[in-house]
């Protein structure tokens, strides 16, 4: 029945087959047997599965145009789920949207056709060391089904070019030791010591 439905959807032009499995292990195992893989979360934080598309399609990167875009909320929750954090609340989503409107943070979105499959962000702050604005690179996330297809490189390049065009003195990223090699390969190749934080 599932195969028949998927074949019908494909015949009628569906580009993606995605579902919310509710975190139920039995459902997850069933859909995995059909070919689906776990793929982030929806805008409410519920876990999703996606049938990876068979056809190749180009991935492009663009600046986020709509601070209230539901696809950004979806990517943010996928990012939070992957790093073991709770889904974003409606209040936090509105705070983020307002920060985007105010120009405090800029998002870049990787798209495969109309679907947003990845993101990253730059937050601006003033540095007394540089006596000008610097940028912090964050929210770097690509949906599992679309990794190893060049989206990471495209996002990093777009962010680095934007930081140059907007006269940011530097663009820095804080990461876990296991991710150092990845960020160095993406052009973040200057080591600036360690980061320590006071968390309220």
Describe the role of every protein-language-model region.
Residues 18-28, 171-182, 196-200:
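Conserved beta-strand-loop-alpha-helix junction that forms the acyl-donor binding cleft
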Residues 40, 59-74:
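A short beta-loop-alpha structural element at the N-terminal edge
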Residues 97-109, 136:
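A short helix-loop-beta-strand connector motif used in the catalytic cores of GNAT acetyltransferases and
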Residues 3-16, 143, 154-170:
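Conserved acyl-CoA
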Residues 125-137, 147:
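A conserved beta-turn-beta hairpin within the catalytic core of GNAT-like acetyltransferases
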Residues 109, 115-124, 136, 141:
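Conserved beta-strand in the GNAT
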Residues 70, 74-97:
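Conserved GNAT-fold acetyl-CoA-binding loop/helix
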Residues 32-41, 184-194:
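Conserved acetyl-CoA-binding loop of GNAT-fold acetyltransferases
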């Amino acid at each position: 029945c599932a195969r028949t439905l998927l074949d019908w959807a494909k015949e009628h032009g569906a580009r993606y087959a995605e579902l919310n499995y509710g975190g139920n292990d039995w459902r997850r195992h069933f859909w995995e047997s059909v070919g689906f893989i776990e793929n982030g979360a929806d805008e409410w934080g519920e876990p999703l599965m996606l049938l990876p598309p068979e056809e190749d399609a180009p991935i492009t990167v663009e600046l986020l145009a709509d601070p209230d875009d539901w696809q950004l909320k979806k990517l943010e929750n996928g990012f939070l789920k992957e790093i073991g954090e709770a889904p974003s609340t409606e209040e936090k989503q509105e705070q983020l949207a307002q920060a985007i409107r105010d120009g405090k943070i800029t998002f870049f979105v990787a798209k495969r056709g109309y679907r947003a499959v990845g993101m990253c962000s730059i937050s601006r702050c003033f540095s007394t060391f540089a006596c000008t604005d610097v940028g912090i690179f964050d929210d770097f996330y690509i949906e599992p089904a679309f990794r190893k297809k060049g989206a990471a490189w495209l996002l990093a390049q777009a962010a680095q070019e934007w930081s140059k065009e907007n006269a940011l003195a530097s663009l820095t990223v804080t990461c876990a030791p296991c991710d150092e090699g990845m960020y160095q390969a993406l052009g973040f190749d200057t080591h600036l010591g360690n980061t320590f934080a006071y968390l309220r």
